[in-house]
C-alpha cells in the first residue's frame, strides 16, 4: 500500500516530464507562484518516468548512431534544470503515476528505486503525453530503455537487407528517409529514383498518400524524395498481420518478420518498424474523463479537464484540445497557467477580482515540417508552403535540437505572456 507523503505545502503537481510538463513547471515557478498570496506555501512537484528529457522529434535520425547528435544536448537531466529555483519551491519525483483520484485530488506514484507514494494535490496538470508504436521513436519508458533499444537496433542494422516501416505520417516518412540516405545514399540529380539500393526499404500506408495533413503536392514531393534514397512507398494498403507477433516491439525489436498487407501481399523484413499512431498515456485516469480514443477530455479553450472537478488540467498530446504537435503545446502553456492562476486565487479569495478566463484557439492552418534525409524535406507553416531549404534550416539540420535548451532550462519562458 502506498504511503501518503506528509507535507505542509500546497502541491501543484505536474504529471509528465517532456515538453508540456517541463514548460508548465517553469512557467508556474516564474510567473504564477510568485504572484499568489502566501506564495511560500506552494510547491511545484514534477513526476516523470524518466529522469532525463530528450528531443523526441530527433529519434528518426538519432536511432542510427550517437554520432548524429551531441548526446549531452539530446538528453538532459530534469532535476538539473530546476536547480535555479529555491529548494522548497520545487520537487522532482522519478516515478510512474499508477492512479489518479480526481475527486480527492491525489495521485499514487510507483517511485523508481523506492516505495510507492500517495501525494495529496492542490492542483494537478496531466501532461503525460503519448507512447509510440515503435520503442525506437520515443521515451515510452525512460532514457536508459530508449538507449538500450537503439543499441540493439544498431547492432542489427549492418546485416539488414529488407526494412519495412508501417505508417505514412511524419515519423514513418522521416525514419524511412534517414535510414534510406544513411544506408543507400541519394540518387543523382538526373535520376528520379535510386536503382538497386543496398537495402530495400518499404514504407506502407493505409492512406491514399503519405503525410495526410499536408496538401497532395507536398505528399507527392516527399514520396519522390523517398524514392531517391531507395524507399518504395505502398499506399492504400493496411498492415493486417505481422509474424511473429510483437515483431518491432521491445521484446522482439529486431526479429525477422513477415508483414502481411490487406490485399494478401507478404513482405519479408529483416527489421520491422511500426510507426502508426500513438497510445495516449492515460491508463491511470478514470475512464469517465477520457474520450473514446483515450485522450483526457479537455475544454478546448481553458485546458481544464471536462467533468474533472476543480484545479484539474491537461496539456500536450494527452489532452483532447488540439492536434498533437509541439507548437500547440507552446501556445497552450501560458493559457493553462493563466487559468490555473485565476483558479488558485479564487480558491483563496472566492470574491477576488481575477478577470475572465484566457481562451486557447487552435490554429488549424496547414503546419508541418518533414525532413526527408539529411538535407531535403517538405512542409508548410501557417498555410504557406515552405521550400526545402527552409525545412532543413528550421528542422532538418538537427530536428529542433536548437530549440530545446531554452525549453528545458526555462529560458524560453523568461517573460510571461
Curated annotation (Swiss-Prot):
It comes from Penicillium herquei. Keywords: FAD, Flavoprotein, Oxidoreductase. GO terms for molecular function: electron-transferring-flavoprotein dehydrogenase activity; flavin adenine dinucleotide binding. 6-hydroxy-FAD binds at residues 16-20, 61, 317. It comes from the Eukaryota. The lineage of its organism: Eukaryota, Fungi, Dikarya, Ascomycota, Pezizomycotina. This is Oxidoreductase phnG. Pfam families: Pyr_redox_2 (PF07992). It catalyses: deoxyherqueinone + NADPH + O2 + H(+) = herqueinone + NADP(+) + H2O. InterPro entries: FAD/NAD-bd_sf, FAD/NAD-binding_dom. The gene is phnG. PANTHER family: APOPTOSIS-INDUCING FACTOR 1, FERROPTOSIS SUPPRESSOR PROTEIN 1. Its EC number is 1.-.-.-.
Amino acid at each position: 500500500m502506498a504511503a501518503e507523503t506528509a507535507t505542509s505545502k500546497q502541491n501543484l503537481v505536474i504529471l509528465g516530464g517532456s515538453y508540456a510538463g517541463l514548460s508548465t513547471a517553469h512557467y508556474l515557478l516564474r510567473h504564477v507562484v510568485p504572484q499568489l498570496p502566501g506564495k511560500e506555501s506552494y510547491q511545484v512537484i514534477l513526476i516523470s518516468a524518466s529522469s532525463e528529457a530528450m528531443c523526441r522529434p530527433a529519434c528518426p535520425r538519432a536511432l542510427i548512431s550517437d554520432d548524429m547528435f551531441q548526446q549531452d544536448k539530446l538528453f538532459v537531466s530534469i532535476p538539473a534544470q530546476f536547480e535555479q529555483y529555491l529548494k522548497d519551491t520545487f520537487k522532482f519525483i522519478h516515478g510512474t503515476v499508477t492512479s489518479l483520484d480526481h475527486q480527492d485530488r491525489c495521485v499514487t506514484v510507483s517511485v523508481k528505486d523506492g516505495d510507492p507514494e500517495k501525494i495529496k494535490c492542490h492542483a494537478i496538470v496531466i501532461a503525460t503525453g503519448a507512447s509510440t508504436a515503435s520503442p525506437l521513436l520515443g521515451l515510452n519508458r525512460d532514457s536508459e530503455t530508449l538507449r538500450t533499444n537503439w543499441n540493439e537496433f544498431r547492432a542489427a542494422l549492418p546485416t539488414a537487407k529488407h526494412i519495412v516501416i508501417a505508417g505514412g505520417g511524419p515519423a514513418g516518412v522521416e525514419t524511412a528517409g534517414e535510414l534510406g540516405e544513411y544506408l543507400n545514399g541519394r540518387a543523382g540529380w538526373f535520376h528520379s529514383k535510386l536503382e538497386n539500393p543496398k537495402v530495400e526499404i518499404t514504407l506502407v500506408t493505409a492512406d491514399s498518400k503519405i503525410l495526410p495533413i499536408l496538401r497532395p503536392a507536398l505528399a507527392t514531393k516527399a514520396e519522390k524524395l523517398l524514392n531517391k534514397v531507395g524507399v518504395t512507398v505502398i499506399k492504400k494498403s493496411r498492415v493486417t498481420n505481422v509474424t511473429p507477433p510483437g515483431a518491432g516491439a521491445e521484446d522482439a525489436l529486431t526479429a525477422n518478420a513477415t508483414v502481411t498487407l490487406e490485399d494478401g501481399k507478404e513482405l519479408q523484413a529483416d527489421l520491422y518498424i511500426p510507426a502508426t499512431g500513438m497510445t495516449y498515456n492515460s491508463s491511470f485516469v478514470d475512464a469517465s474523463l477520457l474520450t473514446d480514443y483515450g485522450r483526457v477530455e479537455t475544454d478546448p479553450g481553458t485546458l481544464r479537464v471536462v467533468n474533472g472537478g476543480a484545479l484539474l488540467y491537461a496539456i500536450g498530446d494527452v489532452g483532447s484540445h488540439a492536434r498533437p504537435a509541439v507548437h500547440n503545446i507552446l501556445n497552450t502553456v501560458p493559457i493553462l497557467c493563466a487559468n490555473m492562476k485565476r483558479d488558485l486565487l479564487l480558491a483563496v479569495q472566492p470574491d477576488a477580482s481575477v478577470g475572465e478566463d484566457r481562451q486557447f484557439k487552435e490554429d488549424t492552418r496547414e503546419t508541418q515540417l518533414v525532413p526527408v534525409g539529411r538535407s531535403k524535406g517538405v512542409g508548410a507553416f501557417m498555410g504557406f508552403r515552405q521550400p526545402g531549404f527552409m525545412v532543413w534550416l528550421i528542422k532538418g539540420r538537427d530536428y529542433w535540437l536548437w530549440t530545446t535548451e531554452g525549453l528545458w532550462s526555462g529560458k524560453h519562458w523568461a517573460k510571461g505572456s
